């Protein structure tokens, strides 16, 4: 099954110092991973924020190199925010959108978020 990556697993895969880097790398083996504009933008937002403090061009290059080397598939963010199951709270709206998007494309959202109780979400062990 193809798996749309949530932002946190994407960050963990690319940052060796991330708390869950080894967990993400071990999980990643033999998986078909997928990105979308939301996860790519989320990655750039996290990497240019205070936790990693990368310059915008450096964050874009890190993501670009990953895409070039790993060749994840890509899907457009082609569902409306109002399509699919409604989020239980505003703080979960992006997570639920990504899970709805994954489900609409016949895949699951791969996440570290154990609190995401959406039928199209799969927690990374």
Where are the language model's segments positioned?
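Active-site regions of enzymes building and remodeling cell-envelope glycoconjugates
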Residues: 119-125
